[in-house]
Swiss-Prot record:
Sites carrying sugar chains: 48, 143
Entry's transmembrane regions: 164-184
Keywords: Glycoprotein, Membrane, Secreted, Signal, Transmembrane, Transmembrane helix
Descriptive protein name: Fibronectin type III domain-containing protein 4
The keyword Cell inner membrane is annotated on this UniProt entry: no
Ranges of biased composition (kind: Basic and acidic residues): 193-205
Domain Fibronectin type-III: 43-136
GO biological processes: negative regulation of inflammatory response; response to transforming growth factor beta
Phenotype of null mutants: Knockout animals show no overt phenotype.
Lineage of the organism: Eukaryota, Metazoa, Chordata, Craniata, Vertebrata
Amino acid sequence: MPLAPPANSVETMASLMPLSPYLSPTVLLLVSCDLGFVRADRPPSPVNVTVTHLRANSATVSWDVPEGNIVIGYSISQQRQNGPGQRVIREVNTTTRACALWGLAEDSDYTVQVRSIGLRGESPPGPRVHFRTLKGSDRLPSNSSSPGDITVEGLDGERPLQTGEVVIIVVVLLMWAAVIGLFCRQYDIIKDNDSNNNPKEKGKGPEQSPQGRPVGTTRQKKSPSINTIDV
């Protein structure tokens, strides 16, 4: 009965067997180099992920990207806890470091994770951040935002006028002043014409004779009438 070869002889035979063409050392080396380049080109995960401007139905998530990395976009995974509602927001060709989350349910718990998008793919997910939306009646105080937070201004806030707006207002005021001045000038001209025509009409009266009597008028004298009756 033939005896099985020892373990060391089996390893020796396996080492002497030719490798398959698909597993040649050259191919393995190229694959390992390619994987190394892809991993090197992927951006790192975002840092300092925070959620601010909490509202009943919206919030704002912001993050930072380590310097020296090429980032062309971001991907945000939003998940509602204890309920359906998963959303992925993806945007490329942008350098923004903040995103508004909308359509949230009030008084609910959510988690978000941010990924950076580079030329060779996405980074690993950043830290998971938990937040809770407010109730419909709750409002944040006006001084709750820190200097580094992204501010969202309402439409009713005071805003200084821009240069273009000031120019438009000045032009409109000048046009109104010109129209009012033209109207006043035309009114003065019409008033002067009326005042020049009235004295001529008032000076005209009935023509008078050299004796001071008006021409065309006769003075009738009344004489007593006498009636004679013959008997």
